[in-house]
């Protein structure tokens, strides 16, 4: 008699960053998260990578970190510019906390194809 497992066949799925397990965020929710990064005094940084390399390599910077940037629109426009330049790449924002020298927040804004 074959063994009947009561455990489901759960497949491991690669998730992307902080909000990877949640439903996709709306544009307003993304703006709120970026505003939070800025309000904390963290330096926004835009990174991108092709989906095939997202788990195996470091992500490439889009320009330099935006040290001291306080304008949400500047950060959003750079995210969109990176997405236009690399439409097939994942694009994420990192909020770098210089005090703790670590990432305060990091999440994917645009998923690549």
UniProtKB/Swiss-Prot annotation:
Pfam families: RuBisCO_small. Induction: Cells grown on urea as a nitrogen source have more enzyme activity than those grown on nitrate (at protein level). RuBisCO activity of urea- but not nitrate-grown cells decreases with rising temperature (from 25 to 28 degrees Celsius, present versus predicted future ocean temperatures); there is only one RuBisCO in this cyanobacterium. InterPro entries: RuBisCO_ssu (IPR024681), RuBisCO_ssu_dom (IPR000894), RuBisCO_ssu_sf (IPR036385). GO terms for molecular function: ribulose-bisphosphate carboxylase activity. It is found in: Carboxysome. Disulfide bonds: none annotated. It comes from the Bacteria. GO terms for biological process: photorespiration; reductive pentose-phosphate cycle. The keyword Hydrolase does not apply. Gene3D superfamilies: Ribulose bisphosphate carboxylase, small subunit. One of its GO terms (cellular component) is carboxysome. Keywords: Bacterial microcompartment, Calvin cycle, Carbon dioxide fixation, Carboxysome, Photorespiration, Photosynthesis. The keyword tRNA processing does not apply. Belongs to the RuBisCO small chain family. The basic functional RuBisCO is composed of a large chain homodimer in a 'head-to-tail' conformation. In form I RuBisCO this homodimer is arranged in a barrel-like tetramer with the small subunits forming a tetrameric 'cap' on each end of the 'barrel'. Heterohexadecamer of 8 large and 8 small subunits. RuBisCO catalyzes two reactions: the carboxylation of D-ribulose 1,5-bisphosphate, the primary event in carbon dioxide fixation, as well as the oxidative fragmentation of the pentose substrate in the photorespiration process. Both reactions occur simultaneously and in competition at the same active site. Although the small subunit is not catalytic it is essential for maximal activity. This is Ribulose bisphosphate carboxylase small subunit. It comes from Parasynechococcus marenigrum (strain WH8102).
């Amino acid at each position: 008699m074959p063994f009947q497992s009561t455990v489901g066949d759960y497949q491991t799925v690669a998730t992307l960053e902080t909000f990877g397990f949640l439903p996709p965020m709306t544009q307003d929710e993304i703006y709120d998260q970026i505003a939070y990064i800025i309000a904390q005094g963290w330096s926004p940084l835009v990174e991108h990578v092709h989906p095939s390399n997202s788990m195996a390599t470091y992500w490439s910077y889009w320009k330099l970190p935006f040290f001291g940037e306080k304008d949400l629109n500047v950060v959003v426009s750079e995210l969109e510019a990176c997405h236009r330049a690399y439409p097939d790449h994942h694009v994420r924002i990192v909020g770098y906390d210089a005090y703790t020298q670590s990432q305060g927040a990091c999440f994917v804004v645009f998923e690549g194809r």
